[in-house]
Amino acid sequence: MKDKIPFVPLKEIATIKQGLSVRSKIWKSSTREEIEDLYGLQKNDVVILRKMYSNGKKIAALVEDTKIVVVPSASSMIIRPDTTKIFPLYLKAFLEFLPSDKVIKELKLTSKKHLLSKGSLSKLLVPLPPVTEQIALSDKYDKVKTVDFYHRYANPIIEQYDSLMKFLWNCYQTDKKDIIS
């Protein structure tokens, strides 16, 4: 009998270099090798499942070993990680950060939640602290395996990001000064 799907901390999400939609049916019987052939999956690629539950929460989960049978209830995608780490806590802070409205206008989107689509995520310019600082912040929430991006109080990783908002604002002000000068 197959093991349950292994969930890993979402702190391990990296900047999305390339997103690829995957038909749900493919996971019901395919091995990683078959998926590699079909979708050009590479060694360090990570598969993300996005599940929509009856209570309206949308959950993202990372799956490292696609040899395990995976049957998502909604949609899935493959991401190709880049070297610069970006964690969901940080992404959430950015999406609720006032200057992100400028990004929304540039992408011609009507709602911030659309920024979470694979196409839009790859275009986001998120000001990032050093990787060590991101890891330190994310390690506080190491036990958190899933994040509901749409409800601030649904998950402790989202409840405690106010310090990141301050950091984002400082980054934004610094960038603005550099552009003006």
Residue ranges with predicted function:
Residues M1-K25, L125-S181:
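Non-catalytic DNA-recognition/assembly elements of restriction-modification systems
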Residues I5, E12, W27, T31-E33, ...:
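Short, functionally important structural connectors and interaction interfaces within domains
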Residues V8, Q42, G119:
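Structured loop/turn residues at beta-strand edges in well-structured enzyme cores
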Residues K11-V46:
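Sequence-specific dsDNA recognition surfaces
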Residues K43, I48-E96:
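A short beta-sheet element
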Residues V69-M77, K108-I135:
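A short glycine-rich beta-alpha junction/loop motif
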Residues L89-L109:
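Short, positively charged
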